Amino acid sequence: MADAYTPRFRKLYDETIVKAMTEKFGYKNHMEVPKITKIVLNMGVGEATQDKKKVEQAALEMTKIAGQKAVITKAKKSIAQFKLREGMPIGAKVTLRRERMYEFLDRFVTIALPRVRDFRGLNPKSFDGRGNYATGLKEQLIFPEISYDSVDKIRGMDVIVATTAKTDDEARELLRLFGFPFPADNEDQKQAA
């Protein structure tokens, strides 16, 4: 029987990241080492109140990007100022876990982020205090699955990475070892001067 397929970033985690994190933080057990539990992609579509097809197009793009069917999100309550009624479709989201999560992470770090215009690294302060990281993207065209001709409107999206890390420092180190391009601390001090 052939060996089961293991994503490249899963192998990276098992073979190198666990050792590096154990050395740096002094974990006594390899099960203490933080890991990524899920990645949530979320795209809000503001124009959806006028045109329902915009949400379907956004969900189709999210499905292509994630490799998993997107769920259309609906408004929880009515807001008159936005002409929004409870239950109206207003966006799309995808929750990735296990192999698909590692595959997306690989494509996000190695292919998509380098294609962002004027990219100077991810914001190292976007952690929530519990070891989770959130970042926003201004356009969906940075993913190779989306062709420029098929896009009706450039939309941004949120990428949320949930980890089992107890502190932001542990999560920052985990994501840095996965290849997330955080600017170095000494560069931040140079810019402040």
UniProtKB/Swiss-Prot annotation:
Which GO biological process annotations does it have?
A: translation
- Keywords per UniProt: Ribonucleoprotein, Ribosomal protein, RNA-binding, rRNA-binding, tRNA-binding
Question: Residues of the signal sequence?
Answer: none
Q: Name one GO molecular function term.
A: rRNA binding
- One Pfam annotation reads Ribosomal_L5
- Superkingdom is Bacteria
Give the CC-aspect GO terms.
Answer: ribonucleoprotein complex; ribosome
Write down the SUPFAM superfamilies for this protein, in alphabetical order: RL5-like (SSF55282)
NCBIfam families, alphabetized: PRK00010.1 (NF000585)
Could you tell me what this protein does? This is one of the proteins that bind and probably mediate the attachment of the 5S RNA into the large ribosomal subunit, where it forms part of the central protuberance. In the 70S ribosome it contacts protein S13 of the 30S subunit (bridge B1b), connecting the 2 subunits; this bridge is implicated in subunit movement. Contacts the P site tRNA; the 5S rRNA and some of its associated proteins might help stabilize positioning of ribosome-bound tRNAs.
Q: What's this protein's family per the entry?
A: Belongs to the universal ribosomal protein uL5 family.
Q: Please describe the quaternary structure of this protein.
A: Part of the 50S ribosomal subunit; part of the 5S rRNA/L5/L18/L25 subcomplex. Contacts the 5S rRNA and the P site tRNA. Forms a bridge to the 30S subunit in the 70S ribosome.
Please state what the protein is called: Large ribosomal subunit protein uL5
What is the protein's species of origin?
Answer: Rhizorhabdus wittichii (strain DSM 6014 / CCUG 31198 / JCM 15750 / NBRC 105917 / EY 4224 / RW1)
The lineage, from the top, is: Bacteria, Pseudomonadati, Pseudomonadota, Alphaproteobacteria, Sphingomonadales
* Protein encoded by which gene: rplE
